[in-house]
Every structure is written in C-alpha cells, then in structure tokens.
Amino acid sequence: MTKVVEISPTTRLEGHSKLTLKVDDQGIVERGDWLSITPVRGIEKLAIGKTMEQVPKIASRVCGICPIAHTLASTEAMEASIGCEIPTDAKLLRTILHAANRIHSIALHNILILPDFYIPGTEKKFNLFANEQPARSVMARIVRIREIAQTIGAIAGGEAIHPSNPRIGGMYYNVSPRAKQKMADLAKEGLVLVHEQMEFMFDVIRNMQNREFVEVAGKQIPLPKKLGYHNQGVMATASMYGSSSLDDNPTWDFTRWKETRPWDWYMGEVTIDLEDPSYPIGGTTKIGTKANPQMEACTGVPTYDGQPVEVGPRARLATFKNFDEKGTFAQHIARQMEYPDCCYTILRCLDNLNTSGKVLADHIPQGDGSMGWAANEAPRGSNIHLARVKDGKVLWYDMLVPTTWNFPTCSRALTGAPWQIAEMVVRAYDPCVSCATHMIVVNEEEKIVTQKLMQW
C-alpha cells in the first residue's frame, strides 16, 4: 500500500525546501516531489522601471551563495538587450571571476555532502568538525581552497560576495601587473590543492558507490546502484562560461523554453501517514498533517522542448566532454572534475590579460526594448537572465536559475530510492533554493501561490 512521508525542511543545502514522497511497503519512493518553501525574493518585479545599471546589483542579492553568477548573467542580459559588445580584457576578467566563484562553490559543497559519506576502509561517516584525521587535514585543505578562490574573486571582481567591478559595457577597472601576478600565484597554489581534493573526493565517492547499505538513524538502508537516475535530458550552454543572444552562434534558444505552473506538475493534496521520529534531524512530518505540493511550491517549472532538464556539472560534462555516467554519484564525480578546469581557465585568462588594455566599451547604447538573454554557467548549472531595456530602463526581466531547472528533474530522480536517502539525491544537485524561488504566496494561511505572469 502506498504511504506518504514528508521531510521538511531538507538540510545541508541553501534555502528552505521539503520532500513529499509517496512510498511503497518497502519504503521505496514511487513518486517524489521536491519543492521550495522559501519566501519569494521578487527580483523580477523589483527590476521593472529601474536603470539597467541598478538591476545587476539587485539581482545579485537574490542569495548570498550565487551573487557572482547573478551579477554576470544580469549584466550580460542588459548588454544583450542593448547590443553592447565588451572589450576582450573585460571578458577575461569576468571569466577569472566566474571560475574563482565555481572553485569556491565546489569546495563549499564538499563540506555539505561529506557527512553523507564513509571514510574509505571504515564504517565511520565523516565528521569534518572532529578533531581527528582525516577530517582535520581535509577541512584545512577545503578552507584554503575557498580562501584562494575568494581572494582571486575579490581582486578581479572588486569584492568576493557582491562584486563591484562588473558593469554594463565591461568592467570599471583593469587590474595592476602586481594584482595579476598575485592571482597567478594563488591559482598555481590552488591547482595543486584542488587536484589533491579531487582525488580524495573520487576515492570517497567510489567507496560509497560500492557499498550495499548505508546507515541512517541507526538503520541499514539499501543503496541502489542506480541512485538518482532519471530519463530527462541535460542542458548546458558551455563547459566553462556561458552564452548570450549576442553570440554569433548562441547555444541556448529561448523559443524552446516554456514555464509552467506548479499545479500542473506537482501532486495535489495528500495526508501524511508515515512518520519516523528518529530521522535526522528532528524526525519527519507528523502523521495526519496535510500537504499540498502543487499549491505550496514557490517556483515555476521551466521546460526545454517541453520537458524538464538537468543542469549543472554532469550536464556540462555530458554535453561538451562525453561524460556518460548517470545518477547521484556521477553528479558528484562531475563536480570534482571541474575543480582543476577552473584553475587552468584562470591561468589561461591571466596569460592573455593585458593589464593596460581597455575594459569598457567606447559606446553604451540605451536600448530600444529588444529582448536579450545571457546564460552564465554557474556552479549549479545554466543561470539564464532575460531582459528588455529601453532608454536605459528595464521594461521586463526574468531569471531562470539552475535550481529552478533542477527541481522537477530531481523530483523524477527520486523514484526508486529508499525514502531515507532521498536527501542524498537532492544534495547531489547542490541546490540554491533561494535563487530558485519565483512565485508569490497570496494566501499565507493555505500557502496558495499565484502564477508568475510572463510577458513578451
């Protein structure tokens, strides 16, 4: 008999989300809905009527994890709308900033997922805050990797959190020769460390992949060989940086995108009739509680060619590097493989960067209302911003954020997993739920949402 269990909130990811799961008598997920319950940010509406210079600053505040990706995607969406090409050295600085942000994000994700994994050769899971090896050395390496990445980002971008250097038309300033050398030295140090961390993570992930059971709340839970598999496609615009409607050959087509309402996708009202008080942390939702994912979800459901897609590291490697593994562990492996690529990208950009070069376009048009889009391959996947700018003011704005793409795909990937490890499937997407929340609650008591209206 099918029962319903709910995990709310999910843990060790950014933002607030929950899992509403229909499971069989063995606790295997027959249908899973992963949905955002994070308060809406409302960035798209805040952008209307603002100057094109203001909107990237506003968009970067959608969350504290992804401000660089949103700054770059938003800035380049404005440039695409007004038809502004930026100088080569400005693009190099943006790419350095982008790659540094990805390194920082991968390292942070290592911290979030390692407690799910076992120390190879033992029956002990990782506790990165334990005063023992290998936790101490691993944590020290991760912290240093993040420090290197954030420092490079601060030099190239002005700040590591909300970068102040990118602007419409390029960058406010170039870097000095000394700053260029500092970034090169850091990237070389980082390259050694990320190779070590990548190999370490490979060992940890493959060790887990070979296990038959994992322990959750004192219970031995079977670990499926096809954990996190789904039949959806993948979407990526580049292996490293991205694409825009200004490109000669754009790698994303906005006419193939459609956004649907959550009540067209998620399950309707259900009653929780399976509960586990021992589930970490604090137990699952109590029996008798009503849940209504299609009315509670605070995101739209974007589709490409009429279907949800997976975005992120595995999608990038599958699209551009013939990576053919699937599922939860493949996502983890793919993310680690991007570590050294980022350092190599930074070093290549620095080799080509002319510190005396121009970083601001000679002419910045004010726009005629044309639609422009930019896709930034953020750490979590394709981060696509769309804009219409006229006379320097934003007429219309939309954000298609990586986790927004991944919500429906991950929901399908939950099928076949024991419900106790459903969060492991979710964490493999490295969600940033705050970024993905773009619906407005109009009935707070019943958590009813309104459709995000799309205008063309």
From Swiss-Prot:
Pfam families xrefs: NiFeSe_Hases
Q: Per the UniProt record, which EC number(s) apply here?
A: 1.12.98.1
Q: Which gene encodes it?
A: frhA
Annotated binding of Ni(2+), by residue: C63, C66, C432, C435
Assembly behavior: Pentamer of two alpha chains, two beta chains and a gamma chain.
Q: How does it sit in the membrane?
A: Peripheral membrane protein
Chief site of localization: membrane
Q: Which reaction does it catalyse?
A: oxidized coenzyme F420-(gamma-L-Glu)(n) + H2 + H(+) = reduced coenzyme F420-(gamma-L-Glu)(n)
Against InterPro entries, the record matches this protein to: Coenz_F420_hydrogenase_asu, Ni-dep_hyd_lsu, Ni-dep_hyd_lsu_Ni_BS, NiFe-Hase_large
Give the stretches traversing the membrane. Answer: none
Gene Ontology MF terms = coenzyme F420 hydrogenase activity; ferredoxin hydrogenase activity; flavin adenine dinucleotide binding; iron-sulfur cluster binding; nickel cation binding
Q: What is this protein called?
A: Coenzyme F420 hydrogenase subunit alpha
Q: Tell me which cofactor or cofactors this protein depends on.
A: Ni(2+); iron-sulfur cluster; FAD
Family to which this protein belongs: Belongs to the [NiFe]/[NiFeSe] hydrogenase large subunit family.
Q: Where in the cell is it found?
A: Cell membrane
| Role description | Reduces the physiological low-potential two-electron acceptor coenzyme F420, and the artificial one-electron acceptor methylviologen.
